Structures are given as structure tokens and as C-alpha cells.
Amino acid sequence: MKKILSVIIAVLFIGIANGQTLLIYGGSNHDVYLGKLNASRYDSESIWNEYGRYGSKYNSNSIWNEYGQYGSKYSSYSPFNEYGSNPPVLVDSQGNFYGYFTANRYRPKRANFDLVNIICEYHEKIREDVGEWYDKIF
């Protein structure tokens, strides 16, 4: 089962990994920078760099901090709240909007692409070993 999941994930993300780097912004006015969604695990601003500010599960502005407002499944500002009303947005470096980063399937303009869907579905497992999941996905 793990092998099948790994292969499916790898195939789904090939296009995204090579595409435009997406930036995550949270907060009520979407003015709180939360890191880069699909950047290298060695990028200091990547959510996949577990030693960096945005990839650490201990940083208050990390989506991987289950006790923080951007990582808790109970916070309206978290992408992992299935009923969240203020989820983060995804934009590129020019500010083009790619959708809301949210597990809330009823949210209009929700980013509905594979990387976001996998992160929302497996966030609890991912936060336990961000590096391992990066290797599976990219």
C-alpha cells in the first residue's frame, strides 16, 4: 500500500514540482507570509525545510505547528480546518491568485490541485516527518 501511494504521489506532483513556486499567505488580510508551498527542502522559506522557519513544527507561523493558528485543525486561519473561514491563499511571485489553501471543500475558489489535496488529507502524518514526505512527493 505504501509503495502504491508513493508512486501515485510522485506521478501527481511531477508537474507542480517543476512549475511556478507558490507562496502561502495567511491572516485575516492575507498579509502573513507562511512560506513557499512547492520549493526545495533546502530553501530556507520552504514548508518542506524542517529546519527552516516555515517547515518547523515548532514555529508559530508554520502550517506544521498543530498548536499554532496556521496549523491547528481548529483555527479558522489554518488550511487544515475543514470548515475554516479564513484559510491561507496561494499566489505566485507576481501576486497571481491560485486559490485558497484549505481542506474546506465548500470554500469558493479553493485551490483544487493534487499537492494541496494531499497536504490537506495527510497533514497530521506529514508534520511528523516533513523530510520523508518531501522525498515521497518530489
Locate predicted features:
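Sec-dependent N-terminal signal peptides
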Residues: 4-15
